[in-house]
Regions:
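Short, compositionally biased
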Residues: 2-185, 252-255, 259-269
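Alpha-helical scaffolds flanking conserved acidic
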Residues: 186-190
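Short hydrophobic beta-strand that contains or immediately precedes a catalytic carboxylate
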Residues: 99, 191-192
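C-terminal, surface-exposed recognition/capping segments
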Residues: 2-18, 194-269
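Enriched - but not universal
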Residues: 48, 75, 118, 192, ...
Length: 269
């Protein structure tokens, strides 16, 4: 057999294996026609941080549009005025989502929120004990937030907290409003699941650099504890320490920071 033909067949077989592997971990749009340069990007995305981009809403139609820092910085002021910046898109380790541009703050200026529901084991939320298989692979923040808000709406727990302050704050978050920005934020914001929150903590340095560049350092992740929407038991849920990256259970009667997240359900470049 001609050596060039043999090499071409080998390269094709290798690409077929790569495509099959990428498809098996969620990159379902990858196929044999995907350029080799994109295959390399998907392989990076599968194992580490692919990139961080500025997430915006286009004022004209409300569509989400993403820009690299260099793309945004090279735009004219007139072109920038057509978009509202809402957060940072993270693409890493087989996942992508939008991180809100700032932590939640209530009407009184408070920056921490109780989880709520102390004493209630929420039906519809899986209890993840310490070392529980799958704990670090929880990326269901939207589903969790839906359940938490619906279950605890108007319910006063044994510690006197009404509802689900942390989840409610995340869902009510607005990165922009019609009155102040010319467009209403219709993004569905959520209280992150533990796996989502851990990715944010893992790449905190890179995220904070882009946040500082795009929104100012007053909006960076602090070194405090942040709530996740992942349940431990009837009195505790999981949180992440953004100082050292530690993970632990936190009593729901205590108040910690909330950084909303918006899901992106596709995995394509």
């Amino acid at each position: 057999m001609d050596k060039n033909i043999a090499n071409a067949m080998l390269m094709r077989l290798n690409k077929q294996d790569q495509v099959a592997a990428l498809q098996s971990i969620g990159f379902t749009t990858v196929n044999e026609n995907t350029p080799a340069s994109d295959i390399a990007k998907y392989m990076q995305w599968a194992g580490t941080l692919l990139d961080l981009s500025l997430a915006t809403l286009r004022i004209e139609d409300g569509e989400q549009v993403f820009f690299t820092a260099s793309e945004w910085n090279s735009m004219s002021a007139n072109n920038r005025s057509k978009y509202i910046r809402i957060g940072i898109r993270l693409r890493a380790e087989c996942h992508q989502f939008i991180i809100a541009k700032s932590d939640c703050v209530d009407a009184g200026g408070n920056k921490t929120f109780k989880w709520g529901g102390y004493g209630t084991d929420l039906r519809g939320l899986k209890n993840y004990g310490s070392g529980n298989q799958g704990l670090y692979d929880t990326f269901d923040g939207k589903e969790n937030t839906d359940v938490i808000i619906e279950t605890l709406a108007g319910v006063k727990d044994t510690q006197g907290t009404v509802g689900a302050p942390a989840a409610e704050a995340a869902r009510a978050y607005k990165a922009c409003t019609l009155e102040s920005d010319g467009i209403e934020d219709t993004t569905v914001w959520n209280l992150p699941a533990l796996g989502e929150l851990m990715l944010m903590a893992k790449y905190k340095t890179e995220i904070n650099e882009l946040i500082t560049s795009m929104f100012g350092n007053q909006n960076i992740f602090t070194n405090d504890w942040y709530w996740s929407s992942t349940e431990y038991d009837a009195s505790s849920s999981w949180g992440v320490d953004f100082n050292y990256g530690g993970v632990n259970t936190l009593g729901r009667q205590y108040a910690y920071r909330v950084r909303p997240l918006a899901a992106i359900n596709t995995l394509s470049l």
